[in-house]
């Protein structure tokens, strides 16, 4: 985060929810990232994400001793868009594999998958534990509606599909989990 108003809000929210931030990397330059989410009346969404100073995170800035205390590392595929964070992500994945820390990755956005598919696949040469994506991201990643290829890259895959059931792929098994009906509420 940056030392700006958004950074203060994020840090305060994390503290309020008992999340340790003593090793949070804070930049005195630039802006904290943000995301604009637009929701349509049928509860679909589209996002416009700006990574801000997080796109400059270098592996040398990360306290891996603290990371190694975690059970799981969660990353968004958005980090593939910056040379610094792309390199950091590759090194984190390697270090987590070596330390037996589970790895979860969200494919983030169909445009990210389309533009950086080969890089994302290279990150998962050694299988990650959990892959999260929506139907469009999965189709883009596999170049088809057949998602079994995803098993090459992750042990457990969760594919959301709007109001349709979420598909869960594990080794040789496939499950469907129905979505709960909910009403979209505009909180602005």
Language model features: what each stretch is:
Residues 72-148, 164-166:
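Conserved beta-alpha-beta core of the PfkB/ribokinase-like small-molecule kinase fold
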Residues 1-34, 41-42, 51, 64:
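Substrate-binding N-lobe of the ribokinase-like
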Residues 21, 103-104, 157:
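Hydrophobic beta-strand scaffold residues
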Residues 94-95, 143-188:
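Conserved phosphate-binding/catalytic region of the ribokinase-like
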Residues 68-69, 126-127, 153:
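Alpha-helix C-terminal capping/helix-to-coil transition sites in glycosyltransferase folds
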Residues 18, 52-59, 110-115, 141:
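Short gly/ser/thr-rich secondary-structure transition/capping motifs
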Residues 59-68, 148-149:
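Short amphipathic alpha-helix with an adjacent loop that forms part of the alpha/beta core around
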Residues 34-38, 46, 165-169:
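Short beta-strand scaffold segments in enzyme catalytic cores
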